[in-house]
Amino acid sequence: MKTRLALPCLLGSLLLSSAVHAASALVPPKGYYAALEIRKGEAQACQAVPEPYTGELVFRSKYEGSDSARSTLNKKAEKAFRAKTKPITEIERGVSRMVMRYMEKGRLRRAGMRPGLLDAWAEDDALLSTEYNHTGKSMRKWALGSLAGAYLRLKFSTSQPLAAYPEQAKRIEAWFAKVGDQVIKDWSDLPLKQINNHSYWAAWSVMAAGVATNRRPLFDWAVEQFHIAAKQVDPRGFLANELKRRQRALAYHNYSLPPLMMIAAFAQANGVDLRGDNDGALGRLAGNVLAGVEDPEPFAERAGEDQDMEDLETDAKFSWLEPYCALYACSPALRERKAEMGPFKNFRLGGDVTRIFDPQEKPSKSTVGNAD
């Protein structure tokens, strides 16, 4: 008798996977098709489902009280922000962690396992409040990218781990689509002076949702936002709106790269090559950031302040190197450096980025890197 596979807890109620996609269907990069590693053994304990967040998306900014550079952390405001957004970050991290664990150590079905994390949030239309501030709409788009990004690994796996859940499928897809539509409303038609890394992360989240639900309008919107971002990269590889962050300008240039690289990788998988936009803006931006890590003086000159390098000492901040080296011919030295820094796990990109783009890299335990 053939044993049937299913998710342990978490996404026991996700989308029905299909092994066959129509020619026009949106697809992710090839690493998302990886099969499960099936090992018999004791199943992981179920994680408690965070209460679906259906309230107003109005949160204090951790930079509250800072000047226009928005670069000075307000510890009291940050504490309040972390406390109020805890259910959202818990589901982001929880889904990412469990998907990584499941893909790496697929377990046989444990009898009686209840439906998992996302179904409850979809059922309650979580994260869809139209009452929000800037920090609130930022949380919405980050969460969508995290959840849809992790889900993609399950949907497109050749092992089809979600095939047992057709009823929940419609609910989850509809929810992703609705949140994606709202993110588009949140971040469309902004003046250029307000388009920065937040818009890039919004575009990544919509790209992930678009491919997860096979909705071309979401894909197209994400690509259009990439075009806008590419036009913002100057001839030397600087982003004017990130230079405004003064002492954190280099850190925010680096923070802009993960969503842009992911969008480019997903576009490439669907026959759209974005590397040539604005005379190779994406590669130029990446090269400038890598040079800045070695010598931050050019950033200090342009931003008007010495650069705070603390964020850049965290290897997880360079998770964009995985899609970068899949899109470009990275030098042997950079590939060696990437291997030393990795494996990269970033829950805001859906989890284990290395396993997707460089699967021969030796995997490590399923911890989720910091993303903010």
Curated annotation (Swiss-Prot):
It is found in: Periplasm. It comes from the Bacteria. Substrate binds at S61, K62, H134, T135, Y252. Catalyzes the depolymerization of alginate by cleaving the beta-1,4 glycosidic bond between two adjacent sugar residues via a beta-elimination mechanism. Degrades deacetylated polymannuronate alginate more efficiently than non-deacetylated polyM. Is able to degrade its own alginate, but at a lower efficiency than that produced from M.pyriferia and P.aeruginosa. May serve to degrade mislocalized alginate that is trapped in the periplasmic space. SUPFAM superfamilies: Chondroitin AC/alginate lyase. Belongs to the polysaccharide lyase 5 family. GO terms for cellular component: periplasmic space. Its EC number is 4.2.2.3. It catalyses: Eliminative cleavage of alginate to give oligosaccharides with 4-deoxy-alpha-L-erythro-hex-4-enuronosyl groups at their non-reducing ends and beta-D-mannuronate at their reducing end. It comes from Azotobacter chroococcum mcd 1. This is Alginate lyase. Residues 1-22 form the signal peptide. CDD domains: AlgLyase. Keywords: Lyase, Periplasm, Signal. GO terms for molecular function: poly(beta-D-mannuronate) lyase activity. Optimum temperature is 30 degrees Celsius. Monovalent cations such as potassium and sodium enhance activity, as well as a combined action of these cations with magnesium. However, other cations like calcium, cobalt, manganese and zinc, or the presence of EDTA, do not affect the enzymatic activity. One of its GO terms (biological process) is alginic acid catabolic process.
